[in-house]
Each structure stands twice: as C-alpha cells, then as structure tokens.
Amino acid sequence: MWLLAGQKAPDHSTIARFRTGFLADACEDLFYQMVRRLEQMDELSKETVFIDGTKLEACANKYTFVWKKSVGKWEEKMFLKIQEAVALLNREYLQSFSVSKETRTHDIQKICCFIEQVCEEQHTVFVHGRGKRKSRNQKYLELFRRFLERQTVYDWHTASFQGRNNYCKTDPDATFMHMKDDHMRNAQLKPGYNVQIGVDSENIVAADIFQDRNDVWTLIPFLETIEKKVGFRYPSVTADSGYESEEAYTYLREQKQKPYIKPQTYEKWKKRSFKQDISKRENMGYDEITDTYICHAGKELKPLFIKKQKSKSGYESEVTVYECEDCTGCPHKEKCTRAKGNKRLYISKSFLEKRQESYENILS
C-alpha cells in the first residue's frame, strides 16, 4: 500500500511491458555505470580481460525447432511441383509464365492475379463440398494460392534463421544448442543463448548475449562491445581454446592487443599417443629453407599449391597444401594417412605463427 499510495495494483501485463520495454536497457545502463565507477576507484587493473562463456536455456518449447536444411528440402520439392503446374497452366491458357528461385514469391503472386482476373471475366462460380465439380479456373486458383501460402511460410522461416542453422518457433531469437548441464547424457539440443562475460580483478566488467553456439564467432564482437561500453581497450586478452582462430589472432594483432589464448591442441600435445603419431605435422621434420616437411619414412612433403578459405564471417585465410613425393609401397602409410594417394598436409602458416606467439605469451 505504501508503494502504490492507495492506487490500483498493476496487472501482470503491465509489469511484463515494463520489464521488456524499459527494465532491460535501464539495467544494462546501471551495470556499466557501476563498471565505470569501479574504474574511477582504481578497482580495475585495466591490463587484461578474462573472457569465458556459458549456455543459458531459453524459456521456450523444446520441440518447436525449425531446421534450415529441412526448410530448404521442402522448398525445393515444392518448387519442382510449381514448375510442373506452371507448364500445364501455360499450355491450357496459352501464356508464358515462369517462376525463378530468386523471385518465386512475386512470380506466384502474378499468376494468382492472372487467374483471379480470368475468373472474374468468365464469371466463374466457386463450389465447395462433396458432389460438386470444381471448374478449371477454381482448381488452378486454389492450387497456386496454396503454393503462395506455403512459399510465404518458407520465406518467413528463411528470414528467421538470420544466418543460423535452426531457430525456435516460440522464441525466434533462441538457437538450439548443447547445454553444458546434460543430466540425461543424451546430448539433447535445447533452445538457448550463448552468454559471454569479461572479468577484470574479480569484477565482471562486461556481459553480452549471442545466438551463435560457437565461442569462436563471439570473441571479436564481444571485444568491440567491451571497448564501447567500458570506454577503453584492454592491452591483453585471456581466453580458453574455444576462442582460438586465425581471424581472432589477426584482429587482436590489428588492435595491438596481446593474446593469451590457449591452443586447441594444447592438451593433446602432452599425451604420449600424440607424440608417437607419425601422421601429425608436429612430429615431422621441417626445412625452412626449402619449405618442406620430412615424414617418418624420410620422404619430403613439398608445397603443391595455395588455396584460399573463407569463414562464415567473411575472413579469408591462405592454406598451403603439401604433398608427399611418393607414398607407394611405404610400410608406414597405414599409420600416416587414410588417403588412397599420397599424404597431404593442409597448413595455414599465418595461423601457426600467430598461435606460437600466443603460446609463448602464456609460457612467459
């Protein structure tokens, strides 16, 4: 009563509108005000930021997922049926309609408008129910309207994916991913979010939420968020192996930030089985002058060609392909490669150089 001052209590929808419309932005603003206050009090080292993430399950139905591959398959099957229907329509109505994949929705709408005009000119009577015979005009109009309705749904799905492979109907922003807490141990996919947190001197200085399940694609946008919200750039960044990529290393070098990112193969390097695996690049000799690797059998793997790979974010990396001179009759081939031909190595020199720099930073 004291809080309301005798006024009527707000209902649940009013509270929900306040939470979604005002509270989220206000809480974020208050949070970063506190971070800036900590900076003023010299409670932050401002030397390195420690980044880690976790998965949070969304408050959404677990069984309302839509998969991009499934939508593409259904859409392709319907497109073939549309092509057959358009060919029949052109033959019967002496028209030259066509439907392309790029403008299929617009093309189907044009066909529907044409049939509606024909129905109006010929005063077509629409019938429904058992025992009624539908006219040719009605059959074609209903058919293409169904196509248009389904295509509209597929377009909605495609727009909702936003570069993802799936989304949840009851929470379109959520992505289906493996949670860290898997009590049933069945690797069930659940709708959730990837939450990233930055820590400095035991204080959380930044937090952000992402749709991507992989930490690799969250590092760069999260660092940009930290710099924008906190107001300064950290000289060094510490993260686990889930954040390692050539793109991340390149970005940190451009921003003059020192990387302390654990290599993805760091734990494998310690194992005896890895050290005895003759197929691994790390266990081969290397001649810097000739740029060749020496395999367990003493044969050279020479650079064959350089290919370019582009990540989903658009980053382009160069990969050098090395091939052994001749693996025919080699007694170690079964342990060295599964390829029918000669042994090949795919190596990004830029990535290895940047990884070594980060590894040396950790050891220092």
Predicted regions located by residue number:
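Anion-binding and metal-coordination hotspots
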Residues: 3-364
